C-alpha cells in the first residue's frame, strides 16, 4: 500500500510517498481503506518537528480520516466489513474525562496516523459517517468539528439567544459558527479578511470584525453586545489573543481555549475578578463524537471544504494550510 511518511527528519520536504506492507487487524481492531484525510494545524506542527522534536521517525501523519472497513479482527462485533467510518482522534477515549493514558492514543502523533491507503484502528476508534456526507466531508469531523462541539455544546452548554465570538475562519471556527447557529445563538466572527467575513456572514454569522482594521476588536465585540460582552468565546489564537477574549466575554462568561496559534503574556487576574470560566478543550471522546453526528445528520450540517489535494501533493496541502489563506478545511484525497 502507499503511505505518506515523515522520513529522515522534520520539515515539509521530508514528507515522502512510500510503499508499506498491507496491515492486518489484531484482536479488537479493524482495517480501514482510507479515502480521504483532512489537515489540522497540529499536523503542520508534527511534520515540522514543532509538536514533538523527539518523535521517533518514520511516522505517518494526520489524525482525521474517513473510509471503508476492509477487515475486522477477532472479537469485533460493533463494526462490519463495508461500513463507512471516520477515525476518532484519540483511539483510547471512548467516554468519560480526558487523562494521560488517553493522550498516548492520539493518531498522527504518539502513533501512526491516517495518511495511508490502509490503516489499522481500534474498533472503538471508528464511528459511522453521519447522514449522506462524502468521505471528504466526513474526514473534517474527528478533530475540527468535535473540538467545536466539545467547546460550545458539551462544555459551554450554549443556549438559544446567547452570543458566541468565533475567531477566524478555519475548520474549528466554522464548525463553531454552524453549531452555535444550530442551537439558536448569535455569532460574531473575527478575521483579517473582509471577503472571509462576508462568507462567514453568508453562513449565518450576525456580525464580522476585521481585526486588522480594528486592532481593539474586543472593544468592538463589547459594543456589538450592548456593552455586556459575549456569553462564549471560541479561542483559537492562544495566549496572544486570550487577553482580548477575556475583555470581550461577559462577566461570568465562558471561554473555550482551543488554539496555540499565537504567543504572548497573559494576565490571569480578570478571570478571577470577573468570574470567567476558562476551559481547555482537547478534541473529545467517542461518546461526544456520536452525539455530534446525530445532530449533524438531523440538521443536515455540511462541512466547509476549501480545497482538496491528491495524496501525492500532501506536502503542498500542508504548505497551503500554513499560508492561512483557506476558508474551512483542507483535505487530502487518498483512495
Regions found by a protein language model. Give the residues of each.
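Glycine-rich beta-strand-centered segment in the early N-terminal region that forms part
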Residues: 22-37, 50-94, 110-112, 125, ...
Amino acid at each position: 500500500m502507499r503511505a505518506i511518511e515523515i522520513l529522515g527528519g522534520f520539515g515539509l520536504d521530508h514528507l515522502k510517498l512510500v510503499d508499506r506492507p498491507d496491515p492486518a487487524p489484531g484482536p479488537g481492531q479493524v482495517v480501514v481503506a482510507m479515502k480521504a484525510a483532512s489537515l489540522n494545524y497540529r499536523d503542520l506542527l508534527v511534520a515540522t518537528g514543532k509538536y514533538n522534536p523527539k518523535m521517533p521517525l518514520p511516522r505517518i501523519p494526520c489524525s482525521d480520516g474517513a473510509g471503508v472497513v476492509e477487515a475486522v479482527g477477532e472479537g469485533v462485533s460493533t463494526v462490519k466489513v463495508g461500513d463507512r467510518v471516520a477515525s476518532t482522534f484519540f483511539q483510547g477515549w471512548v467516554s468519560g474525562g480526558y487523562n494521560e493514558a488517553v493522550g498516548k492514543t492520539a493518531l498522527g502523533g504518539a502513533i501512526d496516523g491516517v495518511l495511508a491507503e490502509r490503516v489499522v484502528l481500534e474498533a472503538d476508534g471508528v464511528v459511522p459517517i453521519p447522514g449522506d456526507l462524502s468521505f471528504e466531508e466526513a474526514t473534517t469531523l474527528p478533530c475540527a468539528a468535535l473540538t467545536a462541539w466539545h467547546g460550545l455544546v458539551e462544555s459551554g452548554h450554549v443556549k438559544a439567544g446567547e452570543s458566541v465570538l468565533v475567531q477566524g475562519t478555519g475548520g474549528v471556527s466554522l464548525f463553531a459558527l454552524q453549531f452555535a447557529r444550530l442551537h439558536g445563538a448569535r455569532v460574531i466572527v473575527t478575521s483579517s479578511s473582509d471577503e472571509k467575513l462576508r462568507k462567514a456572514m453568508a453562513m449565518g454569522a450576525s456580525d464580522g470584525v476585521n481585526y486588522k482594521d480594528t486592532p481593539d476588536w474586543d472593544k468592538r465585540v463589547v459594543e456589538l453586545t450592548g456593552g455586556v460582552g459575549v456569553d462564549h468565546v471560541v479561542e483559537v489564537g492562544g495566549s496572544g489573543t486570550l487577553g482580548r477574549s477575556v475583555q470581550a466575554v461577559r462577566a461570568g462568561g465562558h471561554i473555550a481555549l482551543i488554539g496555540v496559534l499565537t504567543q504572548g503574556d497573559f494576565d490571569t487576574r480578570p478571570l478571577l475578578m470577573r468570574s470567567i470560566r476558562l476551559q481547555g478543550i482537547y478534541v473529545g471522546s467517542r461518546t461526544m463524537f456520536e452525539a455530534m453526528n446525530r445532530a449533524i445528520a438531523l440538521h443536515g450540517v455540511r462541512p466547509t471544504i476549501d480545497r482538496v489535494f491528491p495524496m501525492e501533493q500532501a506536502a503542498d496541502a500542508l504548505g497551503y494550510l500554513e499560508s492561512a489563506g483557506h476558508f474551512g478545511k483542507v483535505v487530502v484525497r487518498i483512495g
